[in-house]
A protein has these predicted regions:
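Soluble "head" domains of membrane/secretory-pathway proteins
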Residues: 2-9, 13, 43-292
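Hydrophobic membrane-insertion alpha-helices, especially the h-region
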Residues: 10-32
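Juxtamembrane cytosolic face of transmembrane helices
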Residues: 34-37
């Protein structure tokens, strides 16, 4: 009887120990190496189809380390990255936390909502949309999927013929921040500078409209436009030097994708990682292919 009890205890001990080690390894891999993501919509068609899943590569940019409990409870927290083997590149398919929580005018990392889009603009780029197509100054490469942008171009040209007055276009056709001074649309916008660390800008009315939310997120202070002057803490602010990197994230299915055209730039710290391989799909020929 004693030997049987010892055997049972031994089995239970090793089962619990093995289970704990496997659980620990799983979470270490989740934090430092990879995790799964799901595409519920067709916003990344044809690269990713609805109801497909892939793995995130966290090694390229380096895995993020932060206090998830402080983040969940709204307390101040710092995001750091482990060393990676590369950096964000133009054209990378990325997975990131949606940059808003309850308030749509205040940048905050949303822990419960993840997006998968393509980084068509990276820190330091000057981005434009010309007749529906993405362009970065100094870059001759095709950004995104040209056939999808052509589809958007044709649709918007029809809209333009039907209603030449841009101010009367429907909301989904208007570009962030949807201000009449800019009058930008998803057909034509820019140029827009995508800030990187140490980028310095003049705080005129246009830049106040474009970058107010990011400056407020970086400083924790309100930035106001008062009497034709940008004001912070009651004092005029003529210029600002950014402390963080940002990117412009866009869905490949340009005619139907909620992305940076509508909610603005994504702080680089909100990026979980770069999309790696596709592991769940109804098309067996696509399974385990690299996501590009």
């Amino acid at each position: 009887m004693k030997k049987i009890l010892e055997k049972i205890v031994n089995i239970v001990y090793w089962t619990v120990t093995t289970g704990f080690i496997l659980f620990l390894v799983y979470w270490i891999l989740q934090i430092t190496t990879t995790c799964s993501f799901h595409t519920p919509s067709g916003s990344m068609t044809p690269t990713l189809l609805p109801d497909e899943s892939g793995l995130v590569n966290k090694w390229k940019m380096g895995a993020r380390i932060f206090n998830i409990f402080d983040a969940a409870e709204g307390r101040p927290y710092e995001i750091r990255r482990l060393p990676g083997y590369g950096r964000l590149e133009r054209g990378d398919v990325i997975v990131f936390n949606y940059p808003y929580q309850d308030r749509k005018d205040s940048i905050a990392m949303n822990l419960g909502l993840y997006y998968c889009k393509r980084a068509v603009g990276i820190p330091g780029d000057t981005l434009e949309i010309i007749d529906g197509f993405y362009h970065v100054r100094g870059c001759l490469d095709t950004l995104g999927v040209a056939s999808e942008q052509r589809m958007l171009q044709e649709y918007m040209q029809e809209q333009e013929q039907h209603e030449p007055d841009i101010s009367r276009w429907r909301s989904w056709m208007r570009f962030y921040p949807k201000d009449p001074q800019l009058n930008w649309t998803i057909k034509d916008m820019g140029p827009m500078l995508i800030p990187e660390v140490n980028t310095e800008i003049e705080l005129d009315r246009k830049n106040w409209l474009l970058y107010r939310r990011y400056i407020e997120w970086e400083t924790g202070r309100k930035l106001q436009w008062r009497d034709s002057v940008t004001v912070m803490d009651g004092k005029p602010l003529k210029t600002y030097r950014f402390k963080e990197n940002y990117c412009f994230a866009a869905g490949d299915h340009a005619i139907d994708s909620r992305d940076s055209r509508y909610f603005g730039l994504v702080p680089e710290k909100f990026i979980v990682g770069v999309a790696g391989i596709l592991w769940k799909t109804k098309d067996g020929k696509r399974r385990f292919r690299a996501i590009k």
